[in-house]
Amino acid sequence: AKQIKLLGLSGTYVQMLTENIPNFRTVAAPFGLGYVPGPWMQSIQVSKGITSVKQGYEAMTGQINIEYRKPQMLEADWINLNVYTNSKGRIEGNADATLKMKDNRWGTTLLVHYDKDLSTHDENNDGFQDMPKTEQVNVMNRWTFLSDTYEFQIGARYLNENRHSGQLESSIVNPYLINLETNRIEGFMKNGFMWNDARESSLALILSGSYH
């Protein structure tokens, strides 16, 4: 699992946020960063030490916030494709499409990711896989609306991942195997109201939910 340690601790002691919304809690915490494809990221912010409880109480040693690509980005392409492979037998494919409408006030982005490990690794020849073989499908769609006094965002995401590890099946008759299948659905909505007579004043309503 991909984790970042802050002040020597990881897991539940580090709060994971996506666009300032608490995410990847409980059973999703060990694999949180693995659920975020790199090409989807617009930016990442890391805060070390105890932070504000504005987004929750979990940030004991730090906080990691990930910002996804947004339709209003100046560099947002209409469509972007990315393919990656390496000598260890890993393949990845990424695609994102952006559509801007009505003077760039309305916009939508579709993000798609797929990766798979084709090879089994046992470099020390102990009969156990050195790392799990994974296959992941990740799809996200978001809509945004921006005006002078109101901002609105809504999005949904689906993830399916399979992890296989344990003993090599060719090395023993009844091998010890580990199979972990994850199905995760997320949804979020963000509303922001700003007043013309006091730009420093605003009101926000943020809703989110997930099924894992």
What residue spans do the PLM features occupy?
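Flexible loop and strand-edge segments within Gram-negative outer membrane beta-barrel domains
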Residues: 117-138, 146-201, 209-212
